[in-house]
A protein has these predicted regions:
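ABC ATPase nucleotide-binding domains
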Residues: 32, 73-79, 83, 87-225
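The feature captures the beta-strand-to-loop junction immediately N-terminal to the Walker
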Residues: 36-38
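Helix-to-loop junction immediately C-terminal to a conserved catalytic motif
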Residues: 51
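Conserved coupling/switch loops of ABC nucleotide-binding domains, chiefly the family-specific signature
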Residues: 57-60, 208
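Conserved ABC transporter NBD signature motif
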Residues: 59-67
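Non-catalytic connector elements of ABC transporters
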Residues: 245-318
Length: 318
């Protein structure tokens, strides 16, 4: 199957430094691929390369199997959604959504505007202006505008980063629903590991300009390629299991036992659980979650064992 978006050996250098380093990646038709990594790893630059806002130093970019490496941004049929909304403040919501619909006649344009606003749950907002909308509503308009021309792909760069937590969760669900309902192909950039795992059909993890793992969320979580991926996706403890192998044990996979060679040096309330930092006699540090009532105070001696039925991932430490 031809990839909706394809990159082959794409590199972008600034001076001698590769900001994007030999990236080969594909986004499949109707797939939502999340691209996650720490700040400054090259995620947004990769998005800009796909959109045509920057040119690669080397490599090939395709859309629907067609080479667009040297094609101007406006001819790539790409929808863009940024974290700062980028709406035209002097235009109404309807005219913002209509911006990429100039080839449609007036009747079809009006129908498409209403269709897109219904899709993002903003029916009736056609004549309002951006300054009259909340941050979440502005982001919905930005998505409607990106989807309106039926783009080959939608690129979303940290679209929820400027929103408070409750609004972010609600908008996240609505945006994903709109993309699914439209059958859109999408690449969503985020530095939020929980967001990447929750939203993506597949997750691509980026570090220092390179893609270090691409797979389904549950595979990336449970079978990380290396220690960086394992640690970036969530807190963990590394336990030696022999022959240079280590077990990756997540906090919820441990069970606390009173008494032993460990000592609780720190604990933090996380709502559903208390998170403990435990240091063993040999200096090994463990991160262990326990439900309220099963938690231990700082200074308590304890041991931590892997819960029955939990199979920690294996990792060769490099």
């Amino acid at each position: 199957m031809t990839a909706a978006v394809g990159l082959v050996s794409v590199t972008r250098r600034i001076g001698a430094r590769p900001v994007v380093d030999d990236v080969t990646l594909e986004v499949r038709e109707r797939e939502l691929l999340t691209l996650v990594g720490p700040s400054g790893c090259g995620k947004s630059t990769l998005l800009r390369l796909i959109a045509g806002l920057e040119r690669p130093s080397s490599g090939t970019i395709t859309l629907g199997g067609l080479d667009v490496t040297d094609v101007a941004p406006e001819r790539r049929r790409i929808g863009l959604v940024f974290q700062e909304h980028a709406l035209f403040p002097h235009l109404t919501v309807g005219r913002n959504v209509a911006f990429g619909l100039r080839r449609l006649d007036r009747r079809r344009r009006a129908e498409r505007i209403e269709e897109m606003l219904e899709l993002v749950r903003l029916t009736g907002a056609t004549r309002r202006y951006p300054h009259e909308l909340s941050g979440g509503e502005q982001q919905r308009v930005a998505l409607a505008r990106a989807l309106a021309p039926d783009p080959a792909a939608v690129l979303l760069d940290e679209p929820f980063a400027n929103l408070d937590a409750s609004l972010r969760d609600e908008l996240r669900a609505d945006v994903v629903a709109a993309l699914r309902n439209r059958g859109a192909t999408a690449l969503l950039v985020t530095h939020d590991r929980d967001e990447a795992l929750a939203l993506g059909d597949r997750v691509a993890v980026m570090r220092d300009g390179a893609i270090v793992q691409v797979d389904r969320p549950e595979v990336v979580w449970s079978a990380p390629n290396d220690e960086f991926v394992a640690g970036f996706l969530g807190p963990m403890s590394l336990l030696p299991s022999g022959d240079g192998q280590f077990q990756i044990v997540r906090p919820h996979q441990f069970e606390l036992v009173i008494g032993g060679d460990g000592r609780v040096v720190e604990r933090e309330f996380r709502g559903a659980v208390w998170r403990h930092t435990i240091v063993r006699a040999d200096g090994t540090q463990l991160i262990v979650d326990a439900e309220p009532g099963r938690d231990l105070e700082v200074g308590a001696t304890c041991a931590a064992t892997v819960r029955p039925g939990h199979l920690p991932a294996q990792l060769t430490r490099r």
